[in-house]
C-alpha cells in the first residue's frame, strides 16, 4: 500500500491547468531536470564475465545488456510527486516561491489511473524514489537486483529533500499526449519525447 496523500508542485499556470482539466502531467524520462535520472549509466555494465561472451567481444555484450535500459528511459513517462508540501527548496524551483502545491488523494488517483478509458487501459506503476551515492554503481553481472526497478527509482542523494514518489507509464497512448503552450512544429517536427502525457483523473482526487 502506497502513500495516502502526495503533493504536486507546479508553477501557477500549470496548477490552474491541472485543476481545470483534472489531469496529471507525465514527462518523458529523458526530459527530466536531472540528466542522470533513469539513465543506464546508473548501472555498471563493464565487468562482462568471460562465460557471458559466447564468442562475442565484451564490448558487444556490454552494449547488448545496456540497450534495453536505454530504450526503457526513452519509453517511460513519469509524474513526480512528493510526500511533503512545505519544502522551501521545492517551492523555490517553481516561479520563485510563487507556485502551487496541490494535494492528491492517492487512493482515488490510483483508482482512476487503473481503469478503462475509451477502450484503453490507462494503468500506471508507482515507486518511491531511493536516494544513493550514484558514483557507487551496482554491477549488472554480479549483483542480484531488479535493475529496471533500480533504474527508475534511484536518484543522487543531493535530491533527497524532494522525498519523491513517482508514477510512470510505459509508452502512453497518443490520446493522452498533448503539446505544452508554446510548443509547435514551426521549426520542424517535434521530438515525441518532448510531448507530455495528460491522463485524466477527476476533481475529487485533489485536496
Located regions from the model:
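Partner-binding and oligomerization surfaces adjacent to conserved cores of proteins
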Residues: 1-207
Amino acid at each position: 500500500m502506497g502513500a495516502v496523500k502526495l503533493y504536486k508542485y507546479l508553477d501557477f499556470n500549470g496548477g490552474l491547468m491541472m485543476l481545470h482539466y483534472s489531469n496529471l502531467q507525465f514527462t518523458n524520462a529523458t526530459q527530466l531536470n536531472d540528466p542522470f535520472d533513469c539513465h543506464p549509466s546508473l548501472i555498471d555494465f563493464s565487468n562482462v564475465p568471460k562465460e557471458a561472451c559466447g564468442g562475442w567481444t565484451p564490448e558487444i555484450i556490454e552494449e547488448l545488456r545496456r540497450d534495453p535500459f536505454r530504450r526503457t528511459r526513452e519509453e517511460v513517462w513519469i509524474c513526480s510527486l512528493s510526500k511533503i508540501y512545505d519544502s522551501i527548496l521545492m517551492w523555490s524551483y517553481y516561479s520563485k516561491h510563487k507556485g502551487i502545491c496541490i494535494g492528491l488523494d492517492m487512493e482515488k488517483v490510483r483508482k482512476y489511473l487503473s481503469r478503462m478509458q475509451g477502450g484503453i487501459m490507462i494503468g500506471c506503476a508507482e515507486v518511491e524514489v531511493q536516494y544513493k551515492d550514484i558514483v557507487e554503481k551496482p554491477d549488472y553481472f554480479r549483483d542480484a537486483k531488479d535493475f529496471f526497478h533500480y533504474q527508475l527509482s534511484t536518484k543522487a542523494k543531493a535530491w533527497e529533500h524532494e522525498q519523491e514518489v513517482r508514477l510512470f507509464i510505459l509508452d502512453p497512448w497518443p490520446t493522452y499526449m498533448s503539446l505544452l503552450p508554446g510548443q509547435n512544429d514551426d521549426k520542424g517536427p517535434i521530438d515525441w519525447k518532448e510531448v507530455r502525457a495528460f491522463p485524466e483523473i477527476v476533481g475529487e482526487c485533489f485536496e
